[in-house]
Amino acid sequence: MNKKLTIEFDFKFDMIFADPPYFLSNGGISLQSGKVVCVNKGEWDKGKSQEDMMAFNMEWLRLCRDKLKDNGTIWISGTYHNIFSVANCLTELGYKILNVITWEKTNPPVNISCRYFKYSTEFVIWARKMQKVPHKFNYELMKELNEGKQMTDVWRMPAIGRWEKTCGKHPTQKPLRLLVRMILASTNQGDWILDPFSGSSTTGIAANLCGRRFAGLEKEEGFCKLSKARREEIENLNNQNILIGHIDDLHFLESSDMVREMPYGDEIPFH
């Protein structure tokens, strides 16, 4: 995350979602669609020493804290490879951890080694910027989404479906369902959301569908092109409706709460 890029934003954000490198690309293999595949994601995801990982996480979390409103919150996804480092950095920087969400995948990949339990979860830390400044939490909406019961910190959702790959896919792409729930839980209409590791801009697509505004940072040109294609795809109302039809949480919103004309790319040019 480049400090010079964050300076371009002369305002602060209501929410940040970050999907930083997990540093798990170590030459391992997995099974996908009946085929053995390598789990390496790219050079940016190759393992680091504990010291290097801590320094990396400390730097980008410090920059994010500077761009977050005092009542803002940040969501960070990870696995055991990086999530403990992230939690330590959050605490040292003065954030207050609110929850650690367990995302239980309903369609996890097969464990072909049969030497340990099958990995079926990822984690998402939810933290606020300040220790004593109240944060936004749309409690009643979350309760409504959960059939009138309190929403727990275990969310059962599938990984990305084919309907999310129509423009191509990112190797660590998160499902729209996951981002929509975070956004609905912690932001209001018109709020600004930042993703410092934007990838294919799933956060941006989810933000737009929920009526929020979005800015993302991404250094890989190929992923920027993929993001632009995905944004252009949902400028078509039929394509919007297809996505909305797959995301149960959006069915609870009034149609007036969802954006029909895309705001992201207006205030800040798309790069």
Give the location of each predicted region.
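Core catalytic lobe of class I
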Residues: M1-L226, F270-H271
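S-adenosyl-L-methionine
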Residues: M1-T6, A229-D266
